[in-house]
């Protein structure tokens, strides 16, 4: 697997370049259907040092556009995969209708609370975005509850750090990179880290249909994942694509918090061939006792200190390797 990016429209690009069911996680921040010079008035997105050529979608076409790109996102997503869609309130209805139209299910409607909203005199200050955390209807998705905090970890007031991190209101500051060239719609590293850690594993494929500043791709690589995606703005694409290969894959993993209290105590460690072989051997021994695959994966998860879906993926890969088809 390798990181692959395309300077083209995401709908045509996905049809041409990404097969069905190969993506583990979609993270994307689609255009807001607001004229570029008006975006800062609603969401306090400052315009200095912004890459030229931001491509917007017209308000009249936004609903149809949302239906079509989300159809492709669902197609490329694995049944165990999920999707995070970042949206402002101005076109939230179109995004929700596109989710329903494409047979996706909202797991959580997350509120991302940021600081420094636009000062107003005649209305309340806008200081949040919506994040729709979705999956294919009827499917079970990857979720790593102990990827950031252990069950026993407490803050200075004695409250559970894990519980706080799992709440659906995320207070994460936006990044102001004074004097540095950036894209108009750039998500903060901490926000991306949280989504990627909770919903994927090392070696998984992350896709962004609107790469922009390539922030999702950069964080994915830094956390040991692979990434793909599309950026229609040639200036933004050329300005960012060359930087990806300079990022050491997985360098952020060493800086993660301790795994205290996590029953999946090996979750953050790299897989070895020996460990994978041991999992497969143990799986066959367990199956001889007459248990179901689901029960076998649960036993393996407990014994090897890895997530349920990690066990399932290892076994599926071993079966595929033995299959002549």
Residue ranges of predicted features:
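Core catalytic lobe of class I
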Residues: 1-237, 299-301, 305-311, 319
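Conserved SAM-binding loop
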Residues: 240-241
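DNA major-groove recognition helix of helix-turn-helix
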Residues: 244, 315, 319
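Pro/Ala/Gly-rich low-complexity, hydrophilic intrinsically disordered segments
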Residues: 245-252
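Short Lys/Arg-enriched helix C-cap and helix-to-coil transition segments
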Residues: 252-258, 322-325
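Short, Lys/Arg-enriched N-terminal segment that forms or immediately precedes the first helix
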Residues: 260-268
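Short, amphipathic alpha-helical "recognition" segments used to contact nucleic acids or chromatin
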Residues: 272-291
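Short, charged amphipathic recognition helices of the HTH superfamily
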Residues: 286-302
């Amino acid at each position: 697997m390798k990181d692959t990016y395309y300077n083209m429209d995401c709908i045509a690009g996905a049809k041409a370049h990404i097969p069905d069911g190969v993506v583990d996680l979609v993270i994307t921040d689609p255009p807001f259907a607001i004229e570029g010079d008006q975006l800062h008035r609603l969401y306090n997105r400052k315009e200095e040092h912004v890459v030229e050529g931001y491509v917007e979608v017209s308000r009249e076409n936004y609903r149809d556009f949302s239906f079509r790109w989300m159809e492709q996102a669902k197609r490329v997503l694995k049944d165990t995969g999920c999707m995070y869609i970042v949206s402002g309130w101005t076109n939230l209805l179109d995004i929700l209708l596109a989710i329903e139209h494409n047979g996706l299910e909202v797991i959580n409607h997350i509120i991302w609370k940021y600081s420094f909203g636009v000062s107003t005199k005649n209305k309340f200050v806008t200081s949040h975005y919506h994040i729709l955390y979705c999956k294919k209807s009827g499917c079970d998705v990857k979720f790593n509850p102990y990827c950031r905090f252990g069950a026993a970890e407490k803050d200075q007031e004695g409250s559970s750090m894990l519980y706080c991190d799992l709440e659906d209101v995320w207070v994460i500051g936006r990044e102001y990179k004074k004097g540095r060239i950036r894209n108009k719609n750039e998500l903060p590293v901490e926000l991306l880290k949280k989504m990627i850690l909770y919903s994927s594993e090392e070696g998984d494929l992350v896709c962004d249909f609107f790469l922009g500043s390539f922030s999702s791709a950069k964080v994915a690589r830094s956390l040991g994942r692979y990434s793909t995606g599309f950026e229609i703005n040639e200036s933004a694409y050329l300005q960012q694509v060359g930087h990806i290969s300079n990022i050491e894959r997985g360098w952020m993993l060493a800086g993660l918090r301790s795994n205290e209290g996590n029953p999946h105590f090996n979750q953050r460690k790299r897989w070895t061939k020996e460990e994978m072989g041991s999992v497969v051997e143990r799986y066959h021994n367990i199956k001889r006792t007459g248990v179901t695959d689901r029960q076998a994966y649960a036993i393996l998860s407990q014994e090897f200190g890895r997530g349920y879906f990690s066990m399932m993926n290892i076994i599926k890969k071993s079966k595929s390797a033995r299959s002549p088809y």
